[in-house]
Amino acid sequence: MEVKIIDIGEDYVRLVIKGEGHTYLNLLQHYLVEDEDVIVARYNIPHPLIGEPEIYIKTSGVDPLEAVKRANEKIIAACNTLLEQL
């Protein structure tokens, strides 16, 4: 996975996440939307074969990259919980 920052401000970020598809981006969006500091989290994959997946996050003033980190920590915790139950 390669992450590239396309645009960033105090309360928003637009990222390209190469090598990923709907599986990861939908999960990331899900956990971002659950964050009370996140106003908008949406992603787009322009074309499934050649498009680079993009995600846009807007927050209520907190660092948007911190929101992405928190969402990824929740994904890791959910995966660890699942692995413990197997």
UniProtKB/Swiss-Prot annotation:
* One CC-aspect GO term: DNA-directed RNA polymerase complex
Database matches in InterPro entries: RBP11-like (IPR036603), RBP11-like_dimer (IPR009025), RNA_pol_Rpb11_13-16kDa_CS (IPR008193), Rpo11-like (IPR022905)
Entry keyword annotation includes Ion transport: no
Q: Extract the PANTHER family matched here.
A: DNA-DIRECTED RNA POLYMERASE I,II,III, DNA-DIRECTED RNA POLYMERASES I AND III SUBUNIT RPAC2
Top enzyme class: transferase
Name of the protein in question: DNA-directed RNA polymerase subunit Rpo11
Give the Gene Ontology MF terms in alphabetical order.
DNA binding; DNA-directed RNA polymerase activity; protein dimerization activity
In its UniProt record, which GO terms are filed under biological process? DNA-templated transcription
Assembly behavior: Part of the RNA polymerase complex.
Q: Which UniProt keywords apply?
A: Cytoplasm, DNA-directed RNA polymerase, Nucleotidyltransferase, Transcription, Transferase
Q: Which SUPFAM superfamilies match?
A: RBP11-like subunits of RNA polymerase (SSF55257)
Q: Which domain of life is it from?
A: Archaea
Task: State the taxonomy lineage.
Answer: Archaea, Methanobacteriati, Methanobacteriota, Archaeoglobi, Archaeoglobales
